[in-house]
């Protein structure tokens, strides 16, 4: 299809936990991703996307949304195994303890340390291009295709 879409499809393929998931509202581009249980596979099937791509999109949203960071940290602290979810992958209690210890050692809040870890992950996955830029390119290319199809 389009170059930007192809780049999105070639990203890393991150395994996903069965419970603990990400989904959106009716308009894919208008609603932030939210952590919801047991709907991840349905979401991926409905929109024909790979779990890794959705997780990477969530990373960008977590960076932009302090409330989402806090909700994610709250889920990390919960004792229920299905709720110990970090960006769609199972998060062991030892990871939570490591996060708390690193935050203390570096004199940072857990949210700041988590944001830094997410930023580093984004750099690895996306190079220096943010997902926002990819989405902008996709929308521009989609608009061009619509104009061609409808003869605008």
Swiss-Prot record:
Chief place of localization: other
Signal sequence extent: none
Subcellular localization: Carboxysome
Record keywords: Bacterial microcompartment, Carbon dioxide fixation, Carboxysome
Leftover remarks: A type 1 McdB protein.
Quaternary structure, from the entry: Self-associates, interacts with McdA probably via the C-terminus of both proteins. Homohexamerizes. Probably a trimer of dimers. Interacts with most of the shell components of the carboxysome (CcmK2, CcmK3, CcmK4, CcmL and CcmO, but not CcmP) via its C-terminus.
Listed name of the protein: Maintenance of carboxysome distribution protein B
Species this protein is from: Synechococcus elongatus (strain ATCC 33912 / PCC 7942 / FACHB-805)
């Amino acid at each position: 299809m389009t170059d930007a879409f192809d780049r999105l499809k070639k990203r890393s393929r991150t395994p996903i936990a069965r419970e603990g998931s990400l989904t959106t509202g009716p308009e894919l581009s208008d609603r932030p991703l939210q952590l919801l249980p047991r709907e991840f596979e349905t979401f991926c099937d409905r929109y024909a996307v790979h779990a890794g791509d959705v997780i990477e999109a969530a990373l960008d949203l977590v960076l932009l949304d302090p409330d989402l960071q806090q909700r994610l940290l709250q889920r990390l602290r919960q004792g229920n195994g299905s709720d110990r979810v970090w960006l769609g992958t199972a998060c062991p209690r030892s990871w939570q303890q490591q996060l708390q210890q690193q935050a203390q050692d570096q004199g940072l809040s857990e949210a700041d340390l988590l944001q830094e870890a997410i930023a580093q992950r984004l750099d690895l996955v996306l190079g220096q291009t943010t997902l926002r830029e990819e989405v902008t390119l996709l929308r521009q290319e989609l608009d061009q295709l619509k104009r061609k199809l409808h003869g605008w």
